[in-house]
Swiss-Prot record:
UniProt-listed GO biological process terms: G protein-coupled receptor signaling pathway; leukotriene signaling pathway; negative regulation of signal transduction; positive regulation of GTPase activity; signal transduction
All copies of domain RGS, residue ranges: 72-187
Subunit structure: Interacts with GNAI1 and GNAQ.
Record-given protein name: Regulator of G-protein signaling 1
InterPro entries in the cross-refs: RGS, RGS_sf, RGS_subdom1/3, RGS_subdomain_2
Membrane topology summary: Peripheral membrane protein
Compositional bias segments (type: Basic and acidic residues): 11-25
GO molecular function annotation: GTPase activator activity
Domain of life: Eukaryota
Amino acid sequence: MPGMFFSANPKDLKGTDQSLLDDKTQKRRPKTFGMDVKAYLRSMIPHLESGMKSSKSKDILSADEVMQWSQSLEKLLANQTGQDVFGNFLKSEFSEENIEFWLACEDYKKTESDLLRCKAEKIYKAFVHSDAAKQINIDFHTRESTAKKIKAPTLTCFDEAQKVIYTLMEKDSYPRFLKSNIYLNLLNDLQANSLK
């Protein structure tokens, strides 16, 4: 059986689509696994950079401020940077819809009355409806109660569902967050930087 001969030089192949060969050779890049991991971690935790600004002031985020997050979920969520770091943690656990819903409810409470209906429907469709893409984990009664309340929306129509999600985060996600590498590495890095 005759063997097939392939030239070592792609240009010697006649009748082939040179653009396909060029694409394949251009896609080869040096392996930079370590750099990719660092880039991934930075995207997950952008707050590890030493120049991170605090949400309360123009000061750099301090280890004391981050340590206060361990006192309660309320203190963590009262801090913009805390919300961001906790949100990144929830993303790593595939449960970011909880904080997204909680933040949407907080924003909703500041809504002008003429915009309530539109905003309530958006939040309901995004998080509460049984077919929502980012459906939150609430019981049937709370889901039905919220559905009724948005028919005549008030600033408090999501309060019951928001409380359920807050309790879920407080009892489930928040304790794991405090033990996570995301939180502990951030705290350790800030403590190390303060000693310099």
